[in-house]
Amino acid sequence: MNLIGPSHLQATDEFALSENLFGVLTEHAAGPLGQNLDLESYSPYNNVQFPQVQPQISSSSYYSNLGFYPQQPEDWYSPGLYELRRMPTESVYQGETEVSEMPVTKKPRMAASSAGRIKGDELCVVCGDRASGYHYNALTCEGCKGFFRRSITKNAVYKCKNGGNCVMDMYMRRKCQDCRLRKCREMGMLAECLLTEIQCKSKRLRKNVKQHADQTVNEDSEGRDLRQVTSTTKLCREKTELTVDQQTLLDYIMDSYSKQRMPQEITNKILKEEFSAEENFLILTEMATSHVQILVEFTKRLPGFQTLDHEDQIALLKGSAVEAMFLRSAEIFNKKLPAGHADLLEERIRKSGISDEYITPMFSFYKSVGELKMTQEEYALLTAIVILSPDRQYIKDREAVEKLQEPLLDVLQKLCKIYQPENPQHFACLLGRLTELRTFNHHHAEMLMSWRVNDHKFTPLLCEIWDVQ
């Protein structure tokens, strides 16, 4: 669940909503890229027409008996808001983008996540060999770690000759891959803990930057003039600029993103007034519902999204919902809260009944994002990149999704060079935050499980996008 604040879109003829609800960012972004835009001047988007959402499905409200925040229209809670419709093919963004210096492979490739090292004589929960650490959410040896990574990366399919009844040990692990992989999953190893292709690029970028930095230091030690390095940096900054098509793409993304504003009355309510744990939970549920609505509308407006297979659209939206909401919450936490209110908000959320084991890493993530001093353009692009991740489950045409994501990565990489030329690792750091975001999918699933046990209620929209029965 997104635990910071709701985000709402301005009402349109196609998407009628309560006047006091929609839009997310209260202030305009600084600089020329954040100014109000006249999209009529951008030819690739002149003819874009966004389809109407299907008629809303009426449902009984969970909140009709509560008076501590305004009651919203019944259709606000409806799963009908989640329905995505196709857009005519001719309205697809056709702008050509400059080829990025960062290579992008045709198919997503995964890599191992960093594992926590351990001490002592702990044994691998899969085969009984000596464990080397926690790999992909389970205590395993290096052998089972590598086997699981290779199996998931290659989408391997094994078949047991003994009907799937092999007892896994250090001997049998080499004889039956089917039972070994099954045991890995039973012991809690998670495919989603493998790094995505984007995060692999981030690791490579970090490594390359470090090697370049070491080389620069060596040259300086041999008597190179430091002023030459400064001159080179300035020259690089002068040459780095967006192409016309990239600027058009960025303007379009920012226009969709900047239509969002954070309703101050709801945030102020949770900051200024103390409620019971149950009331806090209901407020947070309403905030999450609002975030999902904004996510749906922003996603529908991503260039090329509605040309994808309809099932792929659903898979992308459901797969990215948690990560996109936490990223949006990080922006609100770091840029939109009144001064000195961050600690107060954390205190109030801890009183909502949610376990500290989920809240602590969440706020640690918010603070780590704040340290990067991200611009609004970077938040918008990173959100779009998260949504258009080709390695989500159930995606049928991954290459088509990747083609939509690549131009966004190119623009983000250039913006990092423009805004922070003195920090060549900034782009890699932004992508590295996606690794942290992936862990929230697992935490969120555990939270939902605990809430179902406690019989907490969700709006139909949240039930649909979170697959809550």
From Swiss-Prot:
PTM-bearing positions, type N6-acetyllysine: K154, K210
Cellular component GO terms, alphabetical: euchromatin; nucleus; receptor complex; RNA polymerase II transcription regulator complex
Annotated binding of 3beta,7beta-dihydroxy-5beta-cholan-24-oate, by residue: R328, Y366
Zinc finger (NR C4-type): 124-144, 160-184
Cross-linked residues, Glycyl lysine isopeptide (Lys-Gly) (interchain with G-Cter in SUMO1): K119, K272
Induction data: Heterodimer of NR1H4 and RXR activated by farnesol.
Subunit structure: Heterodimer with RXRA; the heterodimerization enhances the binding affinity for LXXLL motifs from coactivators. Binds DNA predominantly as a heterodimer with RXRA. After activation by agonist binding interacts with coactivators. Interacts with NCOA1, NCOA2, PPARGC1A, CARM1, SETD7, PRMT1, GPS2, SMARCA4 and MED1, EP300 and SMARCD1. Interacts with XRCC5 and XRCC6; decreasing NR1H4/FXR transactivation activity towards ABCB11/BSEP. Interacts with PAGR1 AND NCOA6; indicative for an association with an MLL2/MLL3 complex (ASCOM).
Role of this protein: Ligand-activated transcription factor. Receptor for bile acids (BAs) such as chenodeoxycholic acid (CDCA), lithocholic acid, deoxycholic acid (DCA) and allocholic acid (ACA). Plays a essential role in BA homeostasis through the regulation of genes involved in BA synthesis, conjugation and enterohepatic circulation. Also regulates lipid and glucose homeostasis and is involved innate immune response.
Protein name listed in UniProt: Bile acid receptor
Source organism (scientific name): Rattus norvegicus
Gene it is expressed from: Nr1h4
